[in-house]
């Protein structure tokens, strides 16, 4: 069975690599040291410091595994290969809801880089899927849990 690929920009991959390095070179050694100190307290059956450190170690190892998988199966997209006014991964798009003055700005990224609080939406999200491939001036129907609405694409720029 083929592994899932993780679509992302080169910048997103580099960010994941930096995060992986942080886990391997900083967080993993810190938790190993905390486990060592907690063991020195003696009886492990009622040692909450030891249990907490072991739980954190399991979390860290899980994160390392997830990051390694995303990096290994990364599919890098080049937003420069797409027309300047076309919505794609690695682009920032400004849209205005038709019939209102409401404007929204979205940075379209691969799923691994999504962060809705900073306006970074996954290419797999309904909004991004509706916008990808469209150009400035296009009107696009967006399906959301709250209902359907239309937006006009006002601008598209490469995300820095």
Curated annotation (Swiss-Prot):
<comment type="function">
    <text>Necessary for efficient RNA polymerase transcription elongation past template-encoded arresting sites. The arresting sites in DNA have the property of trapping a certain fraction of elongating RNA polymerases that pass through, resulting in locked ternary complexes. Cleavage of the nascent transcript by cleavage factors such as GreA or GreB allows the resumption of elongation from the new 3'terminus. GreA releases sequences of 2 to 3 nucleotides.</text>
</comment>
<keyword id="KW-0175">Coiled coil</keyword>
<comment type="similarity">
    <text>Belongs to the GreA/GreB family.</text>
</comment>
<dbReference type="GO" id="GO:0006354">
    <property type="term" value="P:DNA-templated transcription elongation"/>
</dbReference>
<dbReference type="InterPro" id="IPR018151">
    <property type="entry name" value="TF_GreA/GreB_CS"/>
</dbReference>
<keyword id="KW-0804">Transcription</keyword>
<dbReference type="Pfam" id="PF03449">
    <property type="entry name" value="GreA_GreB_N"/>
</dbReference>
<protein>
    <recommendedName>
        <fullName>Transcription elongation factor GreA</fullName>
    </recommendedName>
</protein>
<dbReference type="InterPro" id="IPR036805">
    <property type="entry name" value="Tscrpt_elong_fac_GreA/B_N_sf"/>
</dbReference>
<dbReference type="InterPro" id="IPR006359">
    <property type="entry name" value="Tscrpt_elong_fac_GreA"/>
</dbReference>
<dbReference type="InterPro" id="IPR022691">
    <property type="entry name" value="Tscrpt_elong_fac_GreA/B_N"/>
</dbReference>
<dbReference type="InterPro" id="IPR036953">
    <property type="entry name" value="GreA/GreB_C_sf"/>
</dbReference>
<dbReference type="InterPro" id="IPR028624">
    <property type="entry name" value="Tscrpt_elong_fac_GreA/B"/>
</dbReference>
<dbReference type="GO" id="GO:0070063">
    <property type="term" value="F:RNA polymerase binding"/>
</dbReference>
<keyword id="KW-0238">DNA-binding</keyword>
<dbReference type="InterPro" id="IPR023459">
    <property type="entry name" value="Tscrpt_elong_fac_GreA/B_fam"/>
</dbReference>
<keyword id="KW-0805">Transcription regulation</keyword>
<dbReference type="InterPro" id="IPR001437">
    <property type="entry name" value="Tscrpt_elong_fac_GreA/B_C"/>
</dbReference>
<dbReference type="Pfam" id="PF01272">
    <property type="entry name" value="GreA_GreB"/>
</dbReference>
<dbReference type="GO" id="GO:0003677">
    <property type="term" value="F:DNA binding"/>
</dbReference>
<dbReference type="GO" id="GO:0032784">
    <property type="term" value="P:regulation of DNA-templated transcription elongation"/>
</dbReference>
<feature type="coiled-coil region">
    <location>
        <begin position="1"/>
        <end position="72"/>
    </location>
</feature>
